């Protein structure tokens, strides 16, 4: 058994008291990212090891695995704690996103270990989409690399405001303060171009040796700041969705018998209470909240992030994908939007193409009207392109087949985040963050139907020798 866990349970006075204490601890979701071989998996392994979150049988298995697959010689290869796929162990890299849970006396944590290779950027974006803080690892020998910049930009694009720059492998540069200072200045120069008001902190460490991870390093007396664990335990996270207006996307209509009809989902933002007047979009029909049903029984109110079932006083037509909000809020449905896109498919994104779109439980179709620009990761400049390649990041104009209720992603990730789905293979090919919904008054009318634009794109792609012109022209 985990001796640290057993001690915590004993200190709390039993399992039940310990579980109650866990419920009242704050939860921090964070990810580790950065370039390949910067030590992301090793850092997580070190955190788990030094906070005594590893069971004795896991530690014994780790010793055996280190002998077979380890890359650290005679030392424990802590990366094997999170690199679970056979291909990951054989190559010594991370491919998939690995999630791990651990807790200390002050906080609970969910870690997403993301891959560093460029071809797995899509996996990194997936891991970052649910996190509140990013640990960006930099190899002290290499400094700031392209993937460091790419992952920094993607993290901020996905709404992460807290960045911890962990300058790793300090043991390989003799724990040099000069190296730490140089990399710190290089990153700050780059970070000045990142969007948003960011909280950036720097920690010099060695994940392999444990310096400044969970305990202060004796090898770096020149550093008097907090350890990485202290930063994670004390950082204050301001959840944007708590202060935003109520948004409740309906995920499921619960009708177990003739006497009950409820609308299940997760409250995306704000709060809702019994008796509140709500409006259903896109229909615009209004009703009152009669009950708030949860697994633990009825509640008088609920808050952002809670899974609930709402029962209304009136039997009205509500289906999956509809949105409930406060009745006094005017939120118009839109049919166009500018969207920040992280493209994840080998086939590039081009104007004129159509995709299935899924957003907040609703599935519809969207046409790409044009690509405004692609972001150059090296210097964050914008350049005009005809298509968006694999791992490309850019701003795209979309037109939807039906009116949708959208928020800007930075205000509400649930009603502002979407995925692109290939209509033939049903594969997710891109992730989108609503930059700005376009009202009907400002949307430019199209003289061509969606079918005509899609057929035109198909002909130009597969029969270029026909010389068909682009119906979208310079868009």
From Swiss-Prot:
Pathway annotation: Sulfur metabolism; hydrogen sulfide biosynthesis; sulfite from sulfate: step 1/3
Q: Name one GO biological process term.
A: sulfate assimilation
Signal sequence extent: none
Describe the family membership recorded for this protein in Swiss-Prot or TrEMBL: Belongs to the TRAFAC class translation factor GTPase superfamily. Classic translation factor GTPase family. CysN/NodQ subfamily.
Stretch list, region G5: 206-208
Pfam families listed in its UniProt record:
GTP-eEF1A_C, GTP_EFTU
For this protein, the Enzyme Commission number is 2.7.7.4
Tell me the segments the record calls region G2: 92-96
> Looking at the record, which segments are called G4?
168-171
Q: Which SUPFAM superfamilies match?
A: EF-Tu/eEF-1alpha/eIF2-gamma C-terminal domain, P-loop containing nucleoside triphosphate hydrolases, Translation proteins
**Coiled coil: which residue ranges?**
none
* Cross-referenced Gene3D superfamilies: P-loop containing nucleotide triphosphate hydrolases (3.40.50.300), Translation factors (2.40.30.10)
Q: Which reaction does it catalyse?
A: sulfate + ATP + H(+) = adenosine 5'-phosphosulfate + diphosphate
Q: Which InterPro entries match?
A: CysN_GTP-bd, CysN_II, CysN_NoDQ_III, G_TR_CS, GTP-eEF1A_C, P-loop_NTPase, Small_GTP-bd, SO4_adenylTrfase_lsu
Top EC group: transferase
Q: Which residues form the tr-type G domain?
A: 25-239
Q: Which GO terms describe its molecular function?
A: ATP binding; GTP binding; GTPase activity; sulfate adenylyltransferase (ATP) activity
Q: Which UniProt keywords apply?
A: ATP-binding, GTP-binding, Nucleotide-binding, Nucleotidyltransferase, Transferase
Subunit? Heterodimer composed of CysD, the smaller subunit, and CysN.
> According to the UniProt record, where is the region G3?
113-116
Q: What does this protein do?
A: With CysD forms the ATP sulfurylase (ATPS) that catalyzes the adenylation of sulfate producing adenosine 5'-phosphosulfate (APS) and diphosphate, the first enzymatic step in sulfur assimilation pathway. APS synthesis involves the formation of a high-energy phosphoric-sulfuric acid anhydride bond driven by GTP hydrolysis by CysN coupled to ATP hydrolysis by CysD.
The keyword Nucleotidyltransferase is assigned to this record: yes
The entry's GTP-binding residues are 34-41, 113-117, 168-171
Region (G1) location: 34-41
Q: Specify the protein name.
A: Sulfate adenylyltransferase subunit 1
